[in-house]
UniProtKB/Swiss-Prot annotation:
Cofactor details (free text): Binds 2 manganese ions per subunit.
Species whose genome carries this gene: Saccharomyces cerevisiae (strain ATCC 204508 / S288c)
Gene designation per UniProt: GLC7
Additional note from the record: Present with 14600 molecules/cell in log phase SD medium.
EC number: 3.1.3.16
Protein name stated in the entry: Serine/threonine-protein phosphatase PP1-2
GO terms for biological process, alphabetical: ascospore formation; cellular bud site selection; chitin biosynthetic process; chromosome organization; chromosome segregation; DNA damage checkpoint signaling; DNA replication checkpoint signaling; glycogen metabolic process
């Protein structure tokens, strides 16, 4: 699959050429280049742990959903790799118009900076979901169905969760009633699809709910919701300080829950053109102080800095 030599630097340059262009301009890579990105990134994901152990300083981003020009804005504010270390929390494809550019740039950066750039799996990095919500159709329209299957093979090897400096637990969705020790995550074998129930499903699908105690059924029809008591117990047991997750649109791009023990990040401003939400990126410094950079939904706005919370 990697027979023809492919220049990742050249791919990144071409993907970044549209900076400053009118949003929506496409970058059409060669099919063999995209296949190379999938194959090479997949081999890196498999070599690295399914539960990443990362160090601050790092910038964390939530859902992107094919909003490629907003991804470029995030990098403009946070610094293009390798200027900053990054962790993305999943949901790169579907819903937005440019899932292909979005995932290709992220995979290219993963290949170029494997120890400084990390992407987790979201519930949309799953064939049964992105078959329905736009990515399959985009692949079919711009390339072919076989390429969509190549992406599926790559997504099936993405890491599931990350821990930053042993204190900040990151995933796309949330906690699971089945999760008692980190070893359970480490034991999950890849490649794997996302099952309909169980630990892996919950980590990518569950949601916090301030109005409940314990666990409850989820309106999504998948996984569960969990109350502040669940968050508090989990952090105490694991000797951690914060859960950082994505998966839900929040008006300001970030939203705290359970006395600031959990934060939801969402990084696609003006989501789908239907929500008037901001997008946010969380910067974690060496002392684990968290601060937020906000992408306003209005097009030509500057980021505003929001104060964070000091961690021990």
């Amino acid at each position: 699959m990697d027979s023809q030599p492919v220049d990742v630097d050249n791919i990144i340059d071409r993907l970044l050429e549209v900076r400053g262009s009118k949003p929506g301009q496409q970058v059409d890579l060669e099919e063999n280049e995209i296949r190379y990105l999938c194959s090479k990134a997949r081999s890196i994901f498999i070599k690295q742990p399914i539960l990443l152990e990362l160090e601050a300083p790092i910038k964390i981003c939530g859902d992107i959903h094919g909003q490629y020009y907003d991804l470029l804005r995030l990098f403009e504010y946070g610094g293009f790799p390798p200027e900053s270390n990054y962790l993305f929390l999943g949901d790169y494809v579907d819903r937005g118009k440019q899932s292909l550019e979005t995932i290709c740039l992220l995979l290219a950066y993963k290949i170029k900076y494997p120890e400084n750039f990390f992407i987790l799996r979201g519930n949309h990095e799953c064939a049964s979901i992105n078959r329905i919500y736009g990515f399959y159709d985009e692949c079919k329209r711009r390339y072919n169905i076989k390429l969509w299957k190549t992406f599926t093979d790559c997504f099936n090897c993405l890491p599931i969760a990350a821990i930053i400096d042993e204190k900040i637990f990151c995933m796309h969705g949330g906690l699971s009633p089945d999760l008692n020790s980190m070893e359970q995550i480490r034991r999950v074998m890849r490649p794997t699809d996302i099952p309909d129930v169980g630990l892996l499903c919950d980590l990518l699908w569950s949601d916090p709910d301030k109005d409940i105690v314990g666990w409850s059924e989820n309106d999504r029809g998948v996984s569960f919701t969990f109350g502040p008591d669940v968050v508090n117990r989990f952090l105490q047991k694991q000797d951690m300080e914060l859960i950082c997750r994505a998966h839900q649109v929040v008006e300001d791009g970030y939203e705290f829950f359970s006395k600031r023990q959990l934060v939801t990040l969402f990084s696609a401003p003006n989501y789908c053109g239907e929500f008037d939400n901001a997008g946010a990126m969380m910067s974690v410094d060496e002392s684990l102080l968290c601060s937020f950079q906000i992408l306003k939904p209005a097009q030509k706005s500057l980021p505003r800095q929001a104060g964070g919370r000091k961690k021990k």
